[in-house]
Structures are given as structure tokens and as C-alpha cells.
């Protein structure tokens, strides 16, 4: 099996397991409905999993959410080790995913410049339907 393919499969499976574990986590400060693990990146030796977290809320709430998740990383690692057959369960490290926020800013800048990619896409689709 291609090592890159296996790594991608493991990252995807870890992401699914983390979402399951999040639902079982008992922390009243955590607003589970607004937390999403946008991506997981395994290190080459598969000992570390960097998990990027998207969260709807203020910057302070996002920072607090990442801190709460990092304090509970032992719980997440144990959950993964019980549900995934690996020699060593990876150490989990949570980070705020700023990619979505950055893409929204880029979109806003494009709109300010007079270019709206969403409207252009809709217009192209309408033109295709007319043909």
C-alpha cells in the first residue's frame, strides 16, 4: 500500500474518531455544536497528530476552546488508541484553523474590488443552461 495513501486514510479515520470523542467529552465550557475538526495532519513517524479546529465565535472563545481541547488531549488519545489499531496512538495537538477566516477575508477583498466569484459562478452556470 502506498504510504501516502495510508497516511491520508489514518488522518481521515482519526478525524472521525475525534468527532465521536468530542460528543463524549464532558466539559460544560465547551460548546460542542460549534466545534469542527477541519483537518488532521500526521507527522511522518505517526507519533503526532496536529488537529485544526474551526469554531464559530469570538477570538477569545476560539482561543479558550483550543485550550480546553488541549487540556483534554489525553482523553482524545485514549479514545483513539481504543478504537484504532496502531502500534502507538499519536499525541494530539490542537490548533485554531485560520484558513476559513482567511478565505472569508479574501472573498470580502474581492467583493470590494468589484469581483464577486459567487455571482460569476452563478452567471456561468446560467449561461451553460441557456446553451
Curated annotation (Swiss-Prot):
Domain of life: Bacteria
GO cellular component: a single term: cytosol
Alphabetical UniProt keywords: Cytoplasm, Ribosome biogenesis
GO molecular function per UniProt: ribosomal small subunit binding
Listed PROSITE patterns: RBFA
Pfam families: RBFA
InterPro entries: KH_dom-like_a/b, RbfA, RbfA_dom_sf, Ribosome-bd_factorA_CS
Principal location class: cytoplasm
Location relative to the cell: Cytoplasm
Biological process, per Gene Ontology: maturation of SSU-rRNA
Cystine pairings recorded for this chain: none
Summary of subunit composition and partner proteins: Monomer. Binds 30S ribosomal subunits, but not 50S ribosomal subunits or 70S ribosomes.
PANTHER family xref list: RIBOSOME-BINDING FACTOR A, CHLOROPLASTIC-RELATED (PTHR33515:SF1)
Function (record text): One of several proteins that assist in the late maturation steps of the functional core of the 30S ribosomal subunit. Associates with free 30S ribosomal subunits (but not with 30S subunits that are part of 70S ribosomes or polysomes). Required for efficient processing of 16S rRNA. May interact with the 5'-terminal helix region of 16S rRNA.
Family note: Belongs to the RbfA family.
Name of the protein described by the UniProt record: Ribosome-binding factor A
Record lineage: Bacteria, Thermotogati, Thermotogota, Thermotogae, Thermotogales
Gene: rbfA
Amino acid at each position: 500500500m502506498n504510504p501516502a495513501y495510508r497516511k491520508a486514510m489514518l488522518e481521515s479515520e482519526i478525524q472521525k474518531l475525534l468527532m465521536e470523542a468530542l460528543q463524549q467529552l464532558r466539559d460544560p465550557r465547551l460548546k460542542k455544536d460549534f466545534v469542527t475538526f477541519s483537518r488532521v495532519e500526521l507527522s511522518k513517524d505517526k507519533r503526532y497528530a496536529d488537529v485544526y479546529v474551526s469554531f464559530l465565535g469570538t477570538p477569545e472563545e476560539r482561543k479558550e476552546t483550543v485550550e480546553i481541547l488541549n487540556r483534554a488531549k489525553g482523553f482524545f488519545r485514549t479514545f483513539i488508541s481504543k478504537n484504532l489499531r496502531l502500534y502507538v496512538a499519536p499525541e494530539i495537538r490542537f490548533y485554531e484553523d485560520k484558513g476559513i477566516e482567511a478565505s472569508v477575508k479574501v472573498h470580502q477583498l474581492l467583493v470590494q474590488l468589484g469581483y464577486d466569484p459567487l455571482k460569476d459562478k452563478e452567471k456561468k452556470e446560467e449561461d451553460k443552461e441557456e446553451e
